[in-house]
Amino acid sequence: SLYRFQIDSNIYQMSTEEYELHLRCFKQEIIQYNPFFNHFSRVGSIMPKENFISQNFDSKEFTLFDDEPIYHSHLTKSILPEGNYAIRYCKSFEEEIKLLPQFLLDIREQGYQIIGDYLCEVIHEQPSLEEQKRDMFIRMQVRIGKKVKNFNLNHFRN
């Protein structure tokens, strides 16, 4: 399951401190209504398909990948759609932002079309605020479908 949480700022334009504050707010919102919830990992973000395709790298939605039921009026629950996903990995948000245009280009060059929102999933994270960086392992993923080949309708006419 995906639990989605709207925020007012673009995740990709946040400083380390801003990101950490928003992340803590997200966690507090969950714990407020689910005091025994203790699996706060695999947090990420969702970028609408249209933003990803137009290279407007703007995400204002945190997501938590978890199968444990979470109850909260501000969270939207959804299921990760079945299908094929293009996947790439990186080590930081800075690297992710640099790779996003190439990731999109690679998908298109392989003959696929984007059919879902872009998902960033932080698989591993260890903050180091003293050094102003985070030790991370990020999965970049987007649902894809095979492009329909153009065909000539005149071929079928007599």
Spans of features found by a protein language model:
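A solvent-exposed interaction/effector surface
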Residues: 1-158
